[in-house]
Each structure stands twice: as C-alpha cells, then as structure tokens.
C-alpha cells in the first residue's frame, strides 16, 4: 500500500464512503415502494422518463429508480438486492469496475444500473463471455425488465439482420463481446443504412471484465474473406523444418550472439517464447532452397515462412497451446482452457502448425475489417464492468480504459482458508503429494477441485490418480462438452474434479451438488423430452429438438408452447424431489470443510490464481485452497532464480519433502508481477499500433456513415473528379517546358473513360495554344458532360444512388487492401528500432502516407467507376451487393467520352413495370413496395429502349 493510500485510503475506500449514504437512501425507500400496487410500481418507469425529459439527471433519480427495481425484483424474481449489491450497482452506474467475489450475485447487481440507464432510451449493452450466459441472463432478468415496462434483446450466433436490429432496438441488450464487436464491423461494411443493426454505444456493463478487456486485448476481432489458395510453400518449409536441430535456452542474452549461446540450427528462448535461426540454420536454408542469401529482399516471404515453421516446432505445443480434433488445429484459450473454435493464429502461424500436424493446410484469408476489443469498448460513452479479480490489473484498467476499481465487501464474511504454498523439488514429488491430498479429501467426504495449466498436465495427473480410484472427472479442452455438468457437480460429497484453468467458467460450484443438473440428468434418463416430441416412436425424436427442449426446461422466457410447459413442470417436480437430499448433503460437505481447491502450478498472472481460489468459499461457505509447486515448474524454472534451487540443495530435501518458505513464495509473486508488467507493456504496445489504425478507421467509417445517412454527395464526386484531374495533370505535365510533358502517359491514364486515342496529338506549333490548366479544364468539362448525360438518362434519384454505390464500393475495396498493407508494414517496422528510430512513430508516419495514397486511389476509382458504369439489363438499378465481391458486378464498362464507342447519347428510355410484391431487381432482397427504388421511381425502373 502506498503512503497516499495509508493517509487517505484507496480510491475504493473513498468511493465506498461516498456511496454508503446513497445505499441508505435506497434502503430507506423500501417501505414507500413496497406499499404500492403492481400497477402503481410499474407506473414509476414512465414517470422516471418524464423526470429526465424535464431536466433531471440519472443521479437525481438514482435512489428512487434503484428502490423501484429492487422492489420489482422481489415481486417478479423472489430476489431482493442486498446492501452490498446496491453498492455494486452504484459503482457500475458511475462507470467503475465492481470487484465482487464469486457467488455474490453479479447478475442481479447489473439490473440496477441497467434499469436506470435504460430510462434514457439510448440503450444499454450487457456483455457476457459466452452465449449460454447471455441467453440465461436475458431470459432470467428479462422478466424483471419487461415487468417494469422495458424491452430486452438478445444477440446470439446465427441470428439474421432483422433479428439483430430488433435486439439492438431494445432498451437493454444482452450478448457476447464477440457478437457486439463483429456487429460493429459488419455495420461498417453495409451498403445501405437500413442494413445496419447497432444504434450507438451509450453504456456497457461488461461481465468478467478482466477476461474481456485484459485477456482478450491482444486478440483483434477480424472479419475475413477468402484469400489466395494456400501456398505449397508451407509444406515445403515444413519438410525443411523437420531436418533442423533445436537448441533451448532459458533466455537469450541480447549482447551475445545466438551462435555462442546455442549449438543447434535454431534456438528457442523459453522465457520470451521466440525462435531464431542460427548461422548453421541459415546455411542449411540457403542450401535446401538453392538461394544465395536468405536475408535478401526477394527471399522475405521464404524467411517469414521459415520463422513461422520453427515457431510451430519450437514454441507451439500440442495439447497445451492447441489440440488437433477432427482433422483441425483448434486453439486452446490459455486463460480458460476452452477450445476457441473459429479462431486462427495470424501471419501464417496457423498454417505452419497445420503442416506440422499433417492436417489440411487451410487457404489464406483476406482481412475485410478488424478492430481490437480495446478500441471497440473505448467507443462507449460510459463503460463499466464486474469481476471477482480486478485489483491486480488496476493500473491497466485505469491507463487504457479510464476505469477505477471499487472492491465491494462480501454479503457474508469469507470463511475460506488459503494455506501457504507447498513447494517440492521435482514435478513427480509434487504430483504424489497432490494425489495424497486428493485421496485424503475424498476419504473425508470433502469435494476437491484440482486446477492444472494445460490439457497435457491434466491427463498426466488423471493417469496417476487412476491407480488409486476411478471415481473422478476430468475437464479440459478435449471433453468440454460436459463442462457445465462437471463443474455444477464438483461440490458433491467426496467429488474429485481435475480441470484446466477455471477462469470464466460461469457456473457456480454449489456444495452438495446442483439440483437443476440432477433434475435434467433424470429427464435425460427417462427420455422425457423424446416422449413429448415423438410419443409413438421416442427413438425417432430429433436430437437437436430434444436438446433445445431440455434447455428450455429451466428457462425463464414467456411461452405458450405445450411441450415447453410440460418440460418445465417435470423439471420443477424433480427439483422439489431432489432439493431436500442436496441440502442435507451440502451440510455434510460444510462439516467436512467445504470445497478444497488445489492449484498444481502458478499461472503467469496472479489474477488467474485468484480466480481458481475463488471457486471455493462462495456466499460465506467454508472452503480451503493450496498451491502445490515444484522447482521444475515453468514459472519457477524460468523466473524463480538460482537461489531457490540452491536453497533446496542446501536443505538436502528429497523430492517428497515439501518446504513452506515465504522467501520462495515472494520470489514467485515478484516473478508474476514482472510477467504481468511485461504482458501489460505488450498489450499497451499493441494498442499504440492499433491507435494509428483506429484513427484511420474512424475517418473511413465516419465518411461511410455520412454516405449511408443519405447525404447528397454529387458535389463531392465532382470535386473528386476535379482533384483527380488536377493531380494527374501536375504529374504528367510537370514543369514549364512543354517538350517534357508526357501527353501519351496522360492519354493512356484516362484512356477508355475520359480520353480517346485521338486526344493530345499535339505538334510543337500547337504548344502556344495549350496550357496545363486548359487541358485540365477540358478533361473536367468532358467528365461533367458524361455525368450530366447520365443524370438525364437515369434521373436524379437513381444517379444519386449510383454515386453512393460507386463511392462505397471503392472505399471498401481500397480499405481492405490498406488493412493488408498496414499489416505488412507493421510486421517489418520493428527492425527500425535497430536504427535508433521509434518503430511506433515510424509506423504512424508511413501509415498516414499510405492512408493519403489510399484516399487518392479512392478518389480516382470512384469517379472512374461512376463515369464508366452502365445499367446492363432491364430494371437493373445498382445491385446491392455484399461488400468484398468483385467491384462492378452488375455493370459493364462503358464510356461516355467523345469519340469512344459507348452508349449513344439521347437514347430513349424504357420503363419496366414491377409488381408491388415482386422482389426488387436491385438485389436488396426487399419487395418492390418496401425498397427505396419504389420511392425514387414509382412508375418503374428505367432502362435502355434497345435492351432485351
């Protein structure tokens, strides 16, 4: 604790003192609102909205709004917010992080600020870590919101645009961080504003905020399309990588050459998780691929592939960093142990691992849009979050997001005992001690949860435990399908559960077991849902429908479906049947000491260790935790220092004798702090680079939004034409000596859209009568004539539509290429550091130069497309295509330039009649009567009279 905190208290302490009087106000209002009828209580919502309209602030109405929500929760859900939960709600409303321990009811806490802020009508986003929690909370808490007159939406995978739009239009919207982020990116790829789904970013409440804003911060959201076919170079380089000898060091010393530190062909730096070719490896590469110099510019692609291949072999470990399942390489989340379906390593690393594992190497992808969670969530006017473990990352939350942490007291005193670390000389000695402790707990009827850091280590421990008992469950990325069931029952008497990292599991471990899961297990056993869905042949019931019905058995959503109601009735019957036995068992487990948590290794982050400990001792229950460590653990070996090892040797301890030493524990915590600091710097560095892209992204998306908002951009298109012509004339007609002017290059540049082969065939005698400005004016006037002729032909509304389409398509295509170019720039920019230049500054300077070039390309491409496109077939207004398809689809290049064969001027226009309920030919997918084309052309769409 700092001197300032000792004198004045921490931010959290000061905030709690400020909040306590407000909490008392809310509690004092309980009798007032408890006396109201349901109708009178529900009438408070429109009354609050009116008060806001009359000039009151949210802070003014906070005590009353919280008191109303609290009373409504009691009437609708049978739950009433405790004083500490009101404290958490106030912290969230103020834009802070409420640090609340596991089991303290964070889901209910969020209803207070969500209800209050939803009264503004701007929308509240409640962000969860998975679809299950989003659905559960939206249904469960949705009953409360709807009773109070607010609408609730849910964003889930597989929903179409209309459903998403409706969900975002609701007062309160639940969804995962991924869904919110991807919807933002997709909204900035649409061609019509009506296709956007989000309506702004006013207020977000982020559940498990540390997981989303810290752990996920280095992983950008990427929408990608199909790129080039996967290069055969991956397999060639993989064959080469298999011939190399690996050398491993704890940490490479910067000032000592790689070759002096390693005798292999490449060296692996364990501490920093990097791989580097040695001189021997470089020679082998040059010989294998028959090249003279691997470092030459023409061999950059090959060198990059080799770097990724040796990283795949030297750093990336199967069943730790990834698993191979059904012929696919699937990333394992290092923080939660979950499989990350749909995620891929970037820069060719994923393909290198696929080649290493002998599975199909997937084709490369092209990035269409991207953003980091850091920059997405910083867009919200007000951001808040909840978690059980935020204090260790306080600096990052404050520096990056401007979020302060308020540690909310528990409702009941914590009874968990955290024992000192038990440290062993070897991993085997540690595992034997763990097994001994597990068996002792099991014998006493005490449930035990063993946390491991990888799939591989969980399976190693399971094999050792099998020699003594088979009565245990293993939860890792390979069998995550039973995750909720295993976690829910981990608190039963004598239960043994071995699991990879428990962060963000989302299901509370209840002592005595979980009644709901027992009820569902019985429903499965008796095939209740199958009999409902297919009474005559239960075995023929659709498995997907069975699972959906089972999920609804304990759902909270309103329904009139007879099957769902029957399933809920059966669920309630079983719930009531099992509850007494579970409560009795829970008392036995409490008497045995509650849940015992065993950590088998320290994580790089203290926060993940704290999350594991936090699974025990929920809501004042007893519990215990202890970490079993060894000198051979990665963290101890890489960061513990030699003094720990020498201490063990001095004490002459065998591998089965533990030591509880504060010095060793302090050394470990110091190492963890260093690692946390280093990882923070990495995330901060990622943000520095993404901030450059973010500034550019905001400019591009801002311009897109103006176009989508329906602004008339005809004047802007004319200015773009003028600027493009002036720029080209300055380039090709540079200087005052007309003999040096490159008329041929200017003619070729505009050939087919502004010039003909006959243009600019000047002789020296003509030079006195021409000027750069005159040529530019001639080209501009010619372009304007073409545009004016098109406007007469198609009509002003359709011409405005064409201008929008052309600009949006060119912006999107150039932006996609720019993302790739910036990515390539970033990959190579780090080398500037060797030249005493700041890579971030260099990236910013060159990035904005590239951005200016992109803007020039957008300008030229847009006016060129507008000048040359022609509607090709009857009724074909500009086709509303998906972004990233080949530009110009639905159009043929024409050209209205004088002397160039194209569509004749003055051609009669024919109108094609379209039925009101027919699909609009523009490709929007809407019926004619609902499409904007009907508003522009109520009589039908114009087309050439001579077209079929």
Model-derived regions: residue spans:
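Glycine-centered loop/turn positions within well-structured domains
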Residues: 219, 448, 505, 815, ...
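Short Cys/His-rich zinc-binding micro-motifs
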Residues: 910-929, 933, 940
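Hydrophobic, well-ordered secondary-structure elements that form the walls
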Residues: 450, 498, 815, 851, ...
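Short, Lys/Glu-rich amphipathic helical modules
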Residues: 445-458, 709-710, 738, 764-768, ...
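Conserved P-loop NTPase motor core
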Residues: 1-630, 634-647, 652, 702, ...
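Extended, charged helical/alpha-beta scaffold domains that provide interaction surfaces
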Residues: 33, 322-330, 336-344, 589-590, ...
């Amino acid at each position: 604790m700092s001197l300032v905190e000792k004198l004045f208290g921490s931010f959290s302490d000061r905030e709690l003192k400020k909040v306590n009087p407000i909490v008392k106000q809310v509690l004092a209002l309980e009798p007032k609102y408890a006396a109201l009828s349901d109708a009178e209580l529900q009438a408070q919502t429109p009354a609050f909205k009116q008060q806001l309209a009359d000039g009151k602030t949210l802070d003014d109405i906070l005590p009353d709004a919280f008191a109303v929500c609290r009373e409504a929760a009691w009437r609708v859900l049978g739950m009433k917010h405790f004083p500490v939960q009101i404290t958490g709600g106030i912290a969230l409303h103020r834009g802070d992080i409420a640090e609340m321990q596991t089991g303290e009811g964070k889901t209910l806490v969020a209803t207070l600020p969500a209800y209050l802020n939803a009264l503004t009508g701007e929308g509240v986003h409640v962000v969860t870590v998975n679809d299950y929690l989003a659905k559960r909370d939206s249904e469960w808490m949705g009953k409360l919101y709807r009773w109070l007159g607010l609408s609730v939406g849910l964003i889930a995978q597989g929903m179409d645009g209309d459903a998403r739009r409706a969900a975002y239009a609701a007062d309160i919207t639940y969804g995962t961080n991924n869904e919110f982020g991807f919807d933002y990116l997709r909204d900035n790829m649409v061609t019509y504003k009506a296709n956007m789904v989000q309506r702004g970013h006013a207020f977000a409440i982020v559940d498990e905020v540390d997981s989303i804003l810290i752990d996920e911060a280095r992983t950008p959201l990427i929408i990608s399309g199909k790129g080039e076919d996967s290069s055969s170079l991956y397999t060639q380089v993989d064959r080469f990588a298999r011939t190399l000898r690996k050398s491993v060091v704890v940490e490479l010393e910067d000032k000592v050459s790689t070759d002096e530190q390693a005798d292999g062909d490449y060296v692996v730096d364990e501490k920093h998780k990097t791989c580097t070719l040695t001189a021997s490896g470089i020679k082998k590469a040059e010989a294998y691929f028959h090249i003279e110099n691997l470092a030459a510019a023409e061999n950059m692609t090959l060198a990059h592939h080799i770097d990724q291949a040796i990283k795949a072999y030297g750093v990336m470990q199967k069943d730790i960093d990834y698993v191979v399942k059904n012929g696919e390489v699937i990333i394992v989340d290092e923080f939660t142990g979950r499989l990350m379906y749909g995620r891929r390593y970037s820069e060719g690393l994923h393909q290198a691992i696929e080649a290493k594992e002998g599975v199909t190497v997937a084709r490369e992808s092209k990035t269409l849009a991207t953003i980091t969670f850091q920059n997405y969530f910083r867009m919200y006017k007000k951001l808040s979050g909840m978690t059980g473990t935020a204090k260790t990352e306080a600096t990052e939350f404050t520096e990056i997001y401007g979020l302060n942490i308020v540690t909310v007291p528990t409702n009941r005193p914590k009874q968990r005992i955290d024992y000192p670390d038990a440290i062993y000389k070897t991993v085997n000695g540690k595992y034997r001690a763990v097994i001994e402790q597990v068996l002792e707990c099991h014998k006493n009827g005490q449930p035990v949860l063993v946390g491991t850091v990888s799939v591989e280590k969980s399976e190693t421990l399971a094999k050792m435990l099998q020699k003594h008992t088979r009565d245990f469950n293993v939860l890792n990325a390979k069998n995550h399908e039973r995750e909720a069931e295993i976690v829910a029952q981990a608190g039963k008497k004598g239960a043994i559960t071995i699991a990879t990292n428990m962060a963000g599991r989302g299901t509370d471990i209840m002592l005595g077991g979980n009644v709901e899961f027992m009820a569902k297990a019985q429903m499965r056993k008796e095939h209740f849902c199958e009999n409902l869905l297919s009474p005559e042949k239960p075995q023929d019931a659709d498995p997907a429908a069975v699972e959906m019905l089972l999920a609804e058995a304990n759902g909270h959503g309103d329904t009139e479906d007879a099957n769902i109601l029957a399933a809920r009735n059966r669920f309630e019957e079983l719930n009531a049947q099992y509850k007494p036995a579970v409560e009795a068992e829970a008392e036995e487990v409490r008497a045995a000491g509650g849940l015992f948590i065993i950590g088998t290794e320290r994580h790089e982050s203290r926060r993940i260790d704290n999350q594991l400990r936090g699974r025990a001792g929920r809501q004042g229950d007893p519990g215990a935790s202890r970490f079993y460590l060894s000198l051979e653990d990665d963290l101890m070996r890489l960061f513990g220092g030699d003094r720990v090892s020498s201490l063990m040797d001095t004490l002459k301890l065998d591998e089965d004798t533990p030591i509880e030493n504060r010095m060793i524990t302090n050394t470990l915590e110091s190492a963890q702090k260093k690692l946390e600091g280093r990882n923070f710097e990495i995330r901060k560095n990622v943000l520095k680079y993404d901030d450059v892209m973010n500034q550019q992204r905001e400019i591009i998306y801002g311009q897109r939004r103006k176009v989508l908002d329906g602004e008339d951009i005809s004047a802007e298109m004319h200015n773009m034409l003028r600027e493009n012509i002036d720029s080209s004339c300055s380039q090709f007609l540079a200087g005052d000596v007309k003999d040096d002017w490159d008329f041929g290059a200017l003619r070729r540049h505009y050939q087919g859209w502004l010039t003909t082969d006959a243009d600019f065939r000047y002789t020296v005698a003509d030079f006195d009568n021409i000027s750069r400005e005159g040529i530019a004016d001639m080209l501009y006037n010619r372009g304007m004539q073409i545009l004016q002729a098109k406007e007469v032909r198609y009509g002003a509304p359709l011409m405005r539509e064409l201008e929008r389409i052309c600009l949006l398509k060119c912006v999107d295509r150039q932006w996609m290429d720019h993302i790739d170019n910036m990515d390539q720039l970033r990959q190579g920019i780090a080398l500037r550091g060797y030249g005493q230049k700041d890579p971030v500054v260099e990236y910013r300077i060159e990035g904005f130069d590239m951005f200016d070039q992109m803007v020039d390309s957008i300008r030229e491409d847009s006016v060129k497309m507008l000048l040359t496109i022609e509607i090709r077939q009857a009724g074909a207004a500009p086709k509303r295509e998906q972004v990233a398809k080949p530009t110009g689809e639905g159009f043929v290049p024409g050209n209205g330039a004088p002397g160039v064969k194209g569509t004749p001027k003055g051609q009669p226009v024919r109108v094609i009649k379209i039925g009101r309920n027919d699909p609009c030919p523009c490709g929007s997918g809407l019926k004619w009567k609902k499409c904007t084309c009907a508003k522009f052309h109520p009589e039908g769409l114009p087309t050439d009279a001579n077209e079929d």
